[in-house]
């Protein structure tokens, strides 16, 4: 059984929830629109964490992320896009290692497009949203970016689960792939 853990910021834990719904065979309102029941009995969610703050990243994941460019009124970190990409990788790797999962998924978005990372210790996939938004200036783009981030995270995980990485890499939103081959 494939074990997955998520450390999520702008996707608010919904990626882990959707994977769990599919793995549990939930249908209807409880089910996953994107994954269906494809993962039933084949995947286990070790943890699905919503971690919007730097202090949360430090205490829960044991990482030392860069200081945020800005901080929201609620204390949420707000990095610019380039730093979000680096932090998403840190989050995915740390949640995988910390929980003993086979796969870690990290998502974060502050100012710009959202960053999505999937890491299994050998393969690191880095994707992004197309939607630009600013966490410090909330408007409808925040929600659009979140929904696209959830969908793309699930599409990325599904491609990984199905061993369809070559097809995934044809998507323009998958920015980087690192394969550490023996």
Curated annotation (Swiss-Prot):
InterPro entries: HcgF
Pfam families listed in its UniProt record: HcgF
UniProt similarity note: Belongs to the UPF0254 family.
Protein's name in the database: UPF0254 protein MK0012
Lineage: Archaea, Methanobacteriati, Methanobacteriota, Methanomada group, Methanopyri
